[in-house]
Amino acid sequence: MVKLSIVLTPQFLSHDQSQFTKELQQHVKSVTCPCEYLRKVINSLAVYRHRETDFGVGVRDHPGQHGKTPSPQKLDNLIIIIIGFLRRYTFNILFCTSCLCVSFLKTIFWSRNGHDGSMDVQQRAWRSNRSRQKGLRSICMHTKKRVSSFRGNKIGLKDVITLRRHVETKVRAKIRKRKVTTKINRHDKINGKRKTARKQKMFQRAQELRRRAEDYHKCKIPPSARKPLCNWVRMAAAEHRHSSGLPYWLYLTAETLKNRMGRQPPPPTQQHSITDNSLSLKTPPECLLTPLPPSVDDNIKECPLAPLPPSPLPPSVDDNLKECLFVPLPPSPLPPSVDDNLKECLFVPLPPSPLPPSVDDNLKTPPLATQEAEVEKPPKPKRWRVDEVEQSPKPKRQREAEAQQLPKPKRRRLSKLRTRHCTQAWAIRINP
């Protein structure tokens, strides 16, 4: 058991007893070493009434006081004991105090190396993650991105965990950005509906520029072709190099479209004139004004607006020329016969020519070559078929009494019918 002698100086005796006890208690509580006995002694100083105790504290009686107070010598001894105790545990006290101060400062001042919302730290971490390869990967709780930890780049707990206020700020900003984006996308559709006239005008201008860019990339027309002074007019006859009958038929052409136009169709021939009187164009009507591939034969490119009529053809046997039937044909050279001076008129159809049995038997107008052959050679009597003979209609079945009253039809011979028909036909031909 440790015995302590406390000496109270006159300086402490001058203070109030309760105040003195409180000061000693606060001073002893700041010490972190086990000294319960010393605390009990200090707490019992206020109520200590015995003389000559183990502490050796001498108390003098003062008249007029209810209690007894220790002597100044004993108070001085008590202070000396306390000072000696504090000197012995000075290092422990300083160490504990420094630890408490450091922990307190760490809670106040946050780490500068952590993701505390500074963009330089985030950019540095993201740049190192992209530029360098290999390393352990972890996900940052603040940026929600992968962060690589390389040699020399140590990532601690302070670099990952962030303050709650920064996280809340980031979340609020993200929600606001999402709302704004959704709102803009809802009104930025192709229909062009805007809340204000300024936004509507901007949208229309953007649409116009977009369409112009699409047309430019599709057509790829050089800048000179877009000038209005480059278009000029030329004549169709000079361009096609043939007489079309309409030399002043206009064509709209452009000088810059020389390498863009296609090959022009050749002049119309006999076959083209027979089949179609108009100039057949390979270019569809919707592409007449658009540039076509370059042509080899013609350096002057044209864009026809209307088809050309056919050009006149050389005389031929197969011409489908329409002749007036009122004009008689010139006499053809025939052997001396009775029909030298006969003139033929095409008003009346000729009898059928001797042809093999076919579908063309009933033709009333034979071709020109057949007519000439008939004129040169005298017609031979044709053997009529039984089917071709004009048969009288069969009499209706009548009663016997009525049949006796009517005369019976006479039967005619085939030779008489044939001779009579030929005579009538040649009579019509000779005597027009």
From Swiss-Prot:
Which PANTHER family does this one have?
A: NUCLEAR PORE COMPLEX INTERACTING PROTEIN (PTHR15438), NUCLEAR PORE COMPLEX-INTERACTING PROTEIN FAMILY MEMBER B15-RELATED (PTHR15438:SF4)
Source organism per UniProt: Homo sapiens (Human)
Listed name of the protein: Nuclear pore complex-interacting protein family member B9
Q: Name one Pfam family in it.
A: NPIP
> What residue spans carry the Basic and acidic residues bias annotation?
374-402
Q: Where is the composition biased (Basic residues)?
A: 408-420
Sorted alphabetically, which InterPro entries does this protein's record hold? NPIP, NPIP_N
State the similarity comment. Answer: Belongs to the NPIP family.
Question: Coiled-coil intervals in this record?
Answer: none
Looking at the record, which segments are called Disordered?
A: 260-280, 353-420
Q: Where is the composition biased (Polar residues)?
A: 270-280
